[in-house]
Each structure stands twice: as structure tokens, then as C-alpha cells.
């Protein structure tokens, strides 16, 4: 669909796509937005530069030494940053593009490699009228049940997927489930099986064989 942005393979590998990131940091407005996001999420990154000869991105970190009030700086290969930081930078491009154009972002496992508080912050950006004046939408799948929060989502914004005995998957909105009020603890109800959609785990039936393999 028009103005729909999907998570691509490069982000699934947590690697910012070279050409897209280079274009982003060469655009003053986009780079400012990216650095503001990295600052707000406590990454410690104050700048991102691209070495055209080596074709390597470097992140800049500033710090104060113990015996000096002056700040020192160091540069780190972007691939040496945490997986969460790399993924945040990789996702920022489609986030910014959708916020500017008012499109829809579709991401599988939004929370992968991200701290839960960071994931919540990204969601709140899309909920903010100030940051999202063009009504961009974020659609994502997650395994983080803490995001099932009435302060983040209405009942009609949360969906459960469930496999039946034949392996087919169905999807249902919490608003369609009888007895689900807007003031209930959604995460607690989900984890105790009230909504369905939880895996059937046969923990007592699993027995690990500690014998050494036969050579």
C-alpha cells in the first residue's frame, strides 16, 4: 500500500543499511532528529560520521576525565555498538519517513534487542500529536507482554494471535472478547490465559539427557 513502510532484511539483521543511513546523516534535519533520538534514549552517542574511504560508520562518544573539566571524545565502529543501538538507528529511517509523510510502519518484533522502556518511548512518539502531526501509524508484533498496558493502548488497539490444533493462526481484538473492561490488568489476564494466545508449554514432560554422546 502507498505510504506503508515495512521492516526490511537489513533491520532484521540489526545492521543499518549503508546507503539509507548515509543519506540520512547527510541531511541536516534527519541527522538532527537521529541525534536527538539517540540522546533521548541514553545511548551516549553525540554524533555519527561516515568515512567514505573505508565505508565505515563511526559513532562519537564524549566523556569527562577524572582530573580534567575538559571533555574528551572517542569514536567507535557502529558495528561495535550494542545490537539494540544498531537496530534503533536502522529503524529510525522508516520511523522518520512515516512521521513526515503520515504513513504506516509495520514491524515484526518491535521490541527485539530493545529495553522495554525504549520500546514504550518509541510507541509514545507515534501517540504524540506534537511528534506525529500527520497521524502516522505503527503496527507491530511483540512478545513483550508488559506493552499490554491501558496507558499505552485501548482495547481495540491490542490483538491476540492464536494457533488452533491444525496449526492455523487466528487474530482477535481484545475489544471483541466478552468481559474485557478497559480498566483490567491486561498483561496479568493475558499471562494467566484469559485471552488465549499463549503457548502450550509441557515443562514437566521435558527431561534432559545428560549422558555423553556416543562417539
Where do the protein language model's features map onto the residues?
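Phosphate-coordinating catalytic segments in nucleotide- and nucleic-acid-processing enzymes
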Residues: 1-92, 100, 195-197, 207-210, ...
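Long, compositionally biased
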Residues: 203-205
